Amino acid sequence: MAAYTIASHPVRDFGTWKSLLDQFESIRKDGGELSAVVLRHSDDQNMVTVINTWDSIEAFQALFNREDLNSGMAEAGVTAPPTIIIGNEA
């Protein structure tokens, strides 16, 4: 059963953040990501929401807990911890 995540957080600069997100694509895919959609908030262009589909919740959790992902988020300019919703298809 597919799992879904919706993560929202501010970034210092969208272009920088998006470039680094794209660099992690193969790592995300190898970690069980099936798809990703990036949204920029209409009222704040440096606030983003990413909607992902995963093989499983466990796959997402394993990837999200990787140290290189967390340091990559800081390098990309994420300025606050993300708000994350995790769920399975009903």
Label the model's feature ranges:
Residues 1-71, 75-90:
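Short S/T/G/P-rich N-terminal loop/turn motif that feeds into the first structured element of a domain
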